[in-house]
Amino acid sequence: MGLSEGEWQLVLXXXXKVEADLAGHGQDVLIRLFKGHPETLEKFDKFKHLKTXXXMKASEDLKKHGNTVLTALGGILKKKGHHEAELKPLAQSHATKHKIPIKYLXXXXEAIIHVLHSRHPAEFGADAQGAMNKALELFRKDIAAKYKELGFHG
């Protein structure tokens, strides 16, 4: 499941594009997630009231959370699969405090791929999408293993 160095470079090149506007990309990812998978919105008490795309776009809290999500993910991706230290506290909080099912992380990964492709179509072609899919699947698989260690089977 590992990525080649070339694949990691494609992932990191996409991550650099995201870093130029973490909050904007993050907000777009969360809106895509919530619109495509409305059940995920129920896990976010502070966003449950946001029912329309216009209300989501106007939410500074949603933008801040998107920034937090993509900052954490960017830090993990930069580790090129050697993300044990970063993953452990994230898995702990998502399993025990937030109780986020793994399937929601897969839905978030789909939203990330969609947003990157829509915002950067020239730079995020099939090869970059494939590499990012592999990197996000590695992340999801590793966090699922941590969930299992914690006794969370969500």
From Swiss-Prot:
The keyword Membrane does not apply. It is found in: Cytoplasm, Sarcoplasm. One of its GO terms (cellular component) is sarcoplasm. Keywords: Cytoplasm, Heme, Iron, Metal-binding, Muscle protein, Oxidoreductase, Oxygen transport, Phosphoprotein, Transport. PROSITE patterns: GLOBIN. SUPFAM superfamilies: Globin-like. Monomeric heme protein which primary function is to store oxygen and facilitate its diffusion within muscle tissues. Reversibly binds oxygen through a pentacoordinated heme iron and enables its timely and efficient release as needed during periods of heightened demand. Depending on the oxidative conditions of tissues and cells, and in addition to its ability to bind oxygen, it also has a nitrite reductase activity whereby it regulates the production of bioactive nitric oxide. The modification Phosphothreonine is found at residue 68. This is Myoglobin. Residues 2-148 form the Globin domain. It catalyses: Fe(III)-heme b-[protein] + nitric oxide + H2O = Fe(II)-heme b-[protein] + nitrite + 2 H(+); H2O2 + AH2 = A + 2 H2O. Heme b binds at residue 94. O2 binds at residue 65. Nitrite binds at residue 65. Its EC number is 1.7.-.-, 1.11.1.-. GO terms for molecular function: heme binding; metal ion binding; nitrite reductase activity; oxygen binding; oxygen carrier activity; peroxidase activity. The keyword Cell inner membrane does not apply. Monomer. The modification Phosphoserine is found at residue 4. Belongs to the globin family. It comes from Delphinapterus leucas. Gene3D superfamilies: 6.10.140.2100, 6.10.140.2110.
